[in-house]
């Protein structure tokens, strides 16, 4: 599936992943089964975080965790749609991720899949806001935490994206 995604660096050197299309629409709720199906295309792929040179793999657990995690279940409205559509830019979100933070594993259920702990990274993405004429009026920017597990096989796997927060002070107008 063709992805309409680009990475743009601002004057301060901060990178943002621009997703130029809204694949997952809906007045009421996100169809998470469609998002899960979309995410399966990434399974088996891997991407390097430029900031720390870690290779992050996409495991077969990501589509289900991303779409059915406790965090996803509590998302409503714009943040739910933001998470659903951020799926289009996962490779780029990983590549531009910064601010690595390590945390020990604390749950027995993750004793194998996160045997060596968890890493969190900051990333940013922007989604288009369309006018009544169907043209893009502006982009809303969101901060997000990329959650990565360090598996017993020694590899790092993207587990979920969390802490999605719209940046109110910044939207990119389109001329």
Named regions from a protein language model:
Residues 1-175:
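Ribonuclease/tRNase effector modules and their secretory precursors
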């Amino acid at each position: 599936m063709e992805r309409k995604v680009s990475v743009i660096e601002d004057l301060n050197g901060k990178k943002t992943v621009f997703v130029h299309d809204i694949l997952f629409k809906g007045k009421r709720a996100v169809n998470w089964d469609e998002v899960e199906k979309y995410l399966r295309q990434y399974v088996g792929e891997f991407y390097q975080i430029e900031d720390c040179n870690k290779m992050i793999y996409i495991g077969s657990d990501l589509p289900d965790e991303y779409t059915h995690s406790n965090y996803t279940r509590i998302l409503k409205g714009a943040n739910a749609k933001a998470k659903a559509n951020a799926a289009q830019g996962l490779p780029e979100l990983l590549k531009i991720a910064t601010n690595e933070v390590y945390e020990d594993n604390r749950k027995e259920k993750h004793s194998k899949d996160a045997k060596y702990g968890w890493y969190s990274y900051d990333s940013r993405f922007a989604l288009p806001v369309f006018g009544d004429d169907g043209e893009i009026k502006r982009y809303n920017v969101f901060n997000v935490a990329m959650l990565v597990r360090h598996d017993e096989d020694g590899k790092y796997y993207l587990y979920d994206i969390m802490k999605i927060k719209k940046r109110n002070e910044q939207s990119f107008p389109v001329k």
